[in-house]
Amino acid sequence: MKLEIPFDEEGIFLERKTRFTGIVSVGKERTQAHIHNTGRLPLLSPGKRVLLKRAKSERRKTKWDLLAVEYREEFVFVHSGYHSLVAERILGEMFPGARIEREKTSGNSVLDFLVDGKTFVEVKGCTFEENGVAMFPDAPTVRGKRHVEELIRCVESGFRALLLILVFLESRCFLPNRKVDPFFSEIFWHALSKGVDVCVFRLKYDGEYLHSMGNLPICEEV
C-alpha cells in the first residue's frame, strides 16, 4: 500500500492550545493548526518539527492541518482523518475484488467497514510506543472498548470480525495499553479468545507518501 499525502510546509510545534488546536511556527509566522486526533499524543511536544498541509477552506479558523510530527528518526503521521482511506486500501489488498462498504451498523454501534457482507472491520490508529512496543490507546477510550465488544457480538452472530490496527511509528510488536486503559486491554484479549482476528500494520510516512511496511506481531503480554 502506497498513498500519496504530500505536506505543504514544515513548521515548529509550540503548544497545544486545545484538544484539536495547536500553535505552530511557520517561518516567521505564529499560527494555528488543526490537530485531527482525539488521543493525548505525548510525542507532540514543544520544539518538535511538524509537517503541515494547507487547509482547503480559507474561511476556516485554523490555517493548517497537522499531518506529522518528528519523533526520533522519522515523522510520525498523526492525522486520523486519513485512517479510513488507508484502511480501505489495505483491505483491498487483503480481500482482492471484495465489496468494501464503509460505516455499517452492527447492533448499537457503527463499525468502520463491512467486507463482502461477511466481515465487520473496526480500525484503530496507534501513535504511541514504549521501549519499542506500539501501544493503543494513549488515552482511555470507552468508545474503543464498545467497538471491540461489538466485534465479539459479530462473531457470536456468525460473521467474521477483524480489528485492524494501524501503527505509524517504528515498533517491533504491538500490545494494548493496559496501564492507560485496563478495560480496553481486557476486552482486547477477550476478543482474541472469542475469534476476533487482529491485524497490525506498520506504516511509514516520508513527507510525500504513506507506505505500508508490513505486519507487526502481537507481543507476549508484559
From Swiss-Prot:
Molecular function terms from GO: DNA binding
Similarity field: Belongs to the SfsA family.
PANTHER family in alphabetical order: SUGAR FERMENTATION STIMULATION PROTEIN A
Protein name (record): Sugar fermentation stimulation protein homolog
Source organism per UniProt: Thermotoga neapolitana (strain ATCC 49049 / DSM 4359 / NBRC 107923 / NS-E)
Gene designation per UniProt: sfsA
